[in-house]
């Protein structure tokens, strides 16, 4: 069920766009941010990527949205102020904020730099902070974040592209690394030709993998996938003949699709001992046939976003290997149209909001 809250007044005035109910429509929203603490950085938001999770949460597809809801967890900003005990950043630094802004810092996951799996992690948007107030995301002019949950953006990286990649870098690479699908010569399928999918394909090629893109997109997208992403082959998932021919040829599959779809045909593409890794947040329960898994010792697993250490490593890795997202930059007042287009997969490959230049305060 959806929930609404009475807005708590913090010291810092802020402005952004928010959904007020499960219609998912966003509109201008005046709110407030907490004051800067000793280990906090305050940042001016420059860019923010639009993720499919933003769309799901705006519409309460997961049943736990809190309104007003300010989306945005692919945030790029410039540090405007630092707390008295901040050590990693200074005013003027370019930084990123991803999917979460707090964790317990004492559980085994946190100790192992896997804060993303901490049972007490706090999401960047639509969650409850330690003080009980709602967290608001990056579709806004400013944020206040503990320095531990901020990543550094190296000089020379295009900041608009980083607005998508602050999440995608860790999210796209983590499943390849954790499931051992980053070894040269392996054949890996990538399901979905969207924001995450195209980055998975790009990272995979840096490891010397053979890549098959699997998509509902028409065959005309084949040349695009091969030319732009370096894919070795392309399958239209709605074509039974195409899905039948390469059965049991893939060492692994990374499924990035958030829309409801069957994974049964994907399991059939896996070799014995193959791994299907889900990173798209599908709303409905999956059909999971046991016999193909048992007889082929196949694995179905999943991953969340990368931890902070891994995400920073991938941010630093990307410019050295020319890995960068392909984006469409849009103004803030285009966000509802962008959401509609995203729902129809009508974007190549990720929307990024130019917050700094297009977010206009209301009186």
Swiss-Prot record:
Binds 2 Zn(2+) ions per subunit. GO terms for molecular function: mannitol dehydrogenase activity; zinc ion binding. InterPro entries: ADH-like_C, ADH-like_N, ADH_Zn_CS, CAD-like, GroES-like_sf, NAD(P)-bd_dom_sf, PKS_ER. Coiled coil: none annotated. The keyword Ribonucleoprotein does not apply. Its EC number is 1.1.1.255. The keyword Oxidoreductase applies. Zn(2+) 2 binds at residues 104, 107, 110, 118. It catalyses: D-mannitol + NAD(+) = D-mannose + NADH + H(+). Keywords: Metal-binding, NAD, Oxidoreductase, Zinc. It is an enzyme of class 1 (oxidoreductase). Its cofactor is Zn(2+). GO terms for biological process: lignin biosynthetic process. It comes from the Eukaryota. Pfam families: ADH_N, ADH_zinc_N. Zn(2+) 1 binds at residues 51, 73, 168. Oxidizes mannitol to mannose. Provides the initial step by which translocated mannitol is committed to central metabolism and, by regulating mannitol pool size, is important in regulating salt tolerance at the cellular level. Belongs to the zinc-containing alcohol dehydrogenase family. This is Probable mannitol dehydrogenase 3. It comes from Stylosanthes humilis (Townsville stylo). The lineage of its organism: Eukaryota, Viridiplantae, Streptophyta, Embryophyta, Tracheophyta. The gene is CAD3.
